[in-house]
Curated annotation (Swiss-Prot):
Function comment: Catalyzes the attachment of glutamate to tRNA(Glu) in a two-step reaction: glutamate is first activated by ATP to form Glu-AMP and then transferred to the acceptor end of tRNA(Glu).
Motif 'KMSKS' region, residue range(s) on this chain: 260-264
Name assigned to this protein: Glutamate--tRNA ligase
Residue span of motif 'HIGH' region: 12-22
Binding site for ATP: K263
Recorded family membership: Belongs to the class-I aminoacyl-tRNA synthetase family. Glutamate--tRNA ligase type 1 subfamily.
Gene: gltX
Catalytic reaction equation(s): tRNA(Glu) + L-glutamate + ATP = L-glutamyl-tRNA(Glu) + AMP + diphosphate
Species of origin: Phocaeicola vulgatus (strain ATCC 8482 / DSM 1447 / JCM 5826 / CCUG 4940 / NBRC 14291 / NCTC 11154) (Bacteroides vulgatus)
Subcellular location: Cytoplasm
């Protein structure tokens, strides 16, 4: 890698919710910047005013805040290379459009949409390039006086990049190696439109990356076909020596079948494709987000990092700091990565297990309050310790362990038929008497006394414990029985046993 300071950027357009593929691109830029002691820039590419969606920019910033991806400079972060919003850089772009016009590397074209459509009808596979430009209405074919007059009259025009034919354009890609494309297949791309006095993506992108001293462009594979054009633009400006290095990341693919992962795939298969819930201001449609679906941000980060990259060993669980140390663009795959949403759930489960019981309890407390439960923290911590290995999401803890906080009002019919025997009411009342006599209601003492009682009486252990579980839980699930009764306490345990006998006898 060159000696220049690493400066990378993530530059979304505020046209809607941030796709999870965009999050992965930002993550890889973040990991690369942190690993090399560089800067991560947040730029907003809002040159397409027709597609602007109110609230999208704020949504993107909030998404990264939740994920823990921090930017060093950019929109809402400040910095010395601003403004960082492209709509605020119009005068800068105009200046560089003029540089290309003055050097003969670009030209003004007046062709109307109707005229271009007519050409497409006339010539199959029509392309505005070296083979057709001299038959079109532009500053290469019209006298200068006429061009000046048309502009003075307010005639709308575009500025096109003049691409010379039959040149092999070499793009060195960190992930894909040498990519070579012949310039003859490229059209004379529009760089600027007089109608809104804004550049197109291609010009703004190159000018901004150069002026912001971006050293590496790490972006999605969908931009690979544009890379030769971008190389030619750097050369046209005389910036070839400071051109950034490119790395085009593999696509995120549908979980089933071929093609790029889309929002429709998430809707169809029941998983989010956005980091946060998104309320579309135009349609009113609400799309699910990873945060609201119960994913932990560190699990999402770890899951995404391994979609298209691997550390070279079998390690799967990695903190953000570990990812920074291990990340290597050369280990990114060229092939697309299938989006395995079940694996995402596995990561979330593993990160719940990694958290301390106190941390998980803190996340579970608001859910308990939503259900009207005011429980002491020490009880919640104990319950979480018993139950967190059974869930993939914090929100699932309620259904999994609500019996610790709310006594059953009904008893599962299937469990009742299978496990509630004819003598169960009598045995449970006996058990209640045994437990009531205990001064020490600790788990260990309960277990010792009850097991001795069962042995002394010659009762069937399974029958007693199954019936005991049904009285406390209402069904046949849950952890070790004496863990449950110890958490419930003596009074609540006795109350539940006796109530169940009343209902079930």
């Amino acid at each position: 890698m060159s000696e220049r300071k690493v400066r990378v950027r993530f530059a979304p357009s505020p046209t809607g919710a941030l796709h999870i593929g965009g999050v992965r691109t930002a993550l890889y830029n973040y990991l690369f910047a942190r690993q090399h002691g560089g800067d991560l820039i947040f730029r907003i590419e809002d040159t397409d005013s027709n597609r602007f969606v109110p609230g999208a920019e704020e949504y993107i910033i909030e998404s990264f805040k939740w994920l823990g991806i921090n930017f060093d400079e950019g929109v809402s972060f400040g910095g010395n290379y601003g403004p960082y919003r492209q709509s605020e850089r119009r005068d800068i772009y105009k200046k560089y459009v003029q540089v290309l016009l003055d050097s003969g590397k670009a030209y003004i074209a007046f062709d109307t949409p109707a005229e271009l459509d007519a050409k497409r009808q006339e010539i199959s596979n029509f392309q505005y390039d070296a083979s057709t430009r001299m038959s079109m209405r532009n500053s290469l074919t019209l006298p200068k006086e006429e061009v000046d007059a048309l502009i003075a009259d307010g005639k709308q025009y575009v500025v096109r990049f003049k691409i010379e034919p039959n040149e092999d354009v070499h793009v060195h890609d960190i992930i894909r190696g040498e990519v070579v494309i012949n310039s003859s297949i490229l059209d004379d791309k529009v760089l600027y439109k007089s109608a809104d006095e804004l550049p197109t993506y291609h010009l703004a992108n190159i000018v901004d990356d150069h002026l912001m001293e971006v050293s590496h462009v790490i972006r999605g594979e969908e931009w690979l076909p544009s890379a030769p054009l971008h190389v030619l633009l750097y050369r046209a400006f005389g910036w070839a020596d400071t051109m950034p290095e490119f790395a085009h990341l593999p696509l995120l693919l549908k979980p089933d079948g071929n093609g790029k992962l889309s929002k429709r795939d998430g809707d169809r298969l029941g998983f989010p494709v956005f980091p946060l819930e998104w309320h579309d201001p135009k349609t009113g449609e609400v799309s699910s987000g990873y945060r609201e679906s119960g994913y932990l941000p560190e699990a999402v980060i770890n899951f995404l990092a391994l979609l298209g990259w691997n550390p070279g060993n079998d390690q799967e669980l990695m903190s953000l700091d570990e990812l920074v140390k291990l990340f290597d663009l050369h280990r990114c795959s060229k092939a697309g990565a299938k989006f395995d949403f079940e694996k995402g759930k596995w990561f979330n489960h593993e990160y719940i297990l990694k958290k301390s019981n106190e941390e998980v309890a803190g996340l579970f407390m608001p859910i308990l309050k939503e259900h009207g439960i005011e429980a002491p923290m020490d009880k919640v911590v104990t319950v979480v310790g018993l139950m967190k290995d059974r869930v993939s999401f914090i929100k699932d803890l309620w259904e999994t362990c609500k019996f610790f906080f709310v006594a059953p009002t009904e008893y599962d019919e299937k469990t009742r038929k299978k496990r509630w025997k004819e003598d169960s009411p009598e045995r449970m009342l006996e058990l209640a008497d045994v437990l009531e006599a205990l001064d020490d209601f600790s788990l260990e003492n309960q277990e010792a006394v009850v097991m001795k009682w069962i042995e002394d009486k010659g009762y069937h252990l399974g029958n007693i414990m199954n019936a005991f579980r049904l009285t406390l839980v209402g069904e046949g699930k849950g952890p070790h029985m004496f863990d449950i009764s110890a958490v419930l306490g003596k009074e609540e345990t006795l109350r539940r046993i006796r109530r169940a006998v009343e209902v079930l006898k």
